[in-house]
Amino acid sequence: MESSEGQVALSSAPASLVQEISALWGEQLGAREVGPEDDFFALGGNSLTGIKIIDRVAQDYGVKLSVRDFYLAQTPTRVAELIEQGRAGR
């Protein structure tokens, strides 16, 4: 992520979680490699794939993401941040 000054912003999610979410997206989207800032929709994501990922996040991490929040997040990094917030009870 970049701030308005062009500096890279640090994610509040652990790098390992971001990697796990990137791998999950790759698995569900049939993509060979998904980067932490890759856009879900640019990768070919759609509503069915989004629901599958949301369900897997609930199963694997115990965090229920809303469809709206998932679609607004758009990247593995931001989804990982939502998972961290959910784990913290925010």
Language-model segments: what does each one mean?
Residues M1-R90:
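Phosphopantetheine-dependent thiolation modules in NRPS/PKS and related acyl-activating systems
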